[in-house]
């Protein structure tokens, strides 16, 4: 993901947690905060240490980033998202991760995601 599509700072994460709305399925929780003045969407990823060792956590983050890269044209701009991975995603394949992210994005009200 390009730098303009990332959330890195703790206060930006906290703003999305406190002011945003959340949607979830069994694998992911997605917090969403509207930022109309922002030209792009931004994504922050969080994978807890409860999920596995560093290898497993980094694998999950790589799969989520790749799915976001493939879906970037369909994700609404002007929004911040924080994606939190849950334990079941540790055993998922890339296709399952992508399908699960599409499902949770649709639940959050995104109309443009069609896959």
Curated annotation (Swiss-Prot):
DNA damage recorded as keyword: no
Enzyme Commission number(s) of this protein: 3.1.26.5
InterPro entries hit by this protein: Ribosomal_Su5_D2-typ_SF, Ribsml_uS5_D2-typ_fold_subgr, RNase_P, RNase_P_CS
GO biological process, one term: tRNA 5'-leader removal
Catalyzed reaction equations: Endonucleolytic cleavage of RNA, removing 5'-extranucleotides from tRNA precursor
UniProt GO molecular function: 3'-tRNA processing endoribonuclease activity; ribonuclease P activity; tRNA binding
Subunit structure: Consists of a catalytic RNA component (M1 or rnpB) and a protein subunit.
Main function: RNaseP catalyzes the removal of the 5'-leader sequence from pre-tRNA to produce the mature 5'-terminus. It can also cleave other RNA substrates such as 4.5S RNA. The protein component plays an auxiliary but essential role in vivo by binding to the 5'-leader sequence and broadening the substrate specificity of the ribozyme.
Family under the similarity heading: Belongs to the RnpA family.
Protein name, entry field: Ribonuclease P protein component
């Amino acid at each position: 993901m390009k730098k303009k599509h990332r959330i890195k700072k703790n206060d930006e994460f906290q703003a999305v947690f406190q002011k945003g709305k959340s949607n979830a399925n069994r694998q992911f929780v997605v917090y969403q905060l509207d930022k109309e003045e922002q030209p792009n969407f931004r994504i922050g990823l969080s994978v807890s240490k409860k999920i596995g060792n560093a290898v497993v956590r980094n694998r999950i983050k790589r799969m989520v980033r790749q799915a976001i890269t493939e879906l970037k044209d369909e994700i609404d701009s002007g929004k911040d998202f924080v994606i939190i991975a849950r334990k079941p995603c540790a055993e998922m394949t890339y296709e399952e991760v992508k399908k699960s992210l599409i499902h949770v994005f649709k639940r959050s009200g995104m109309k443009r995601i069609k896959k």
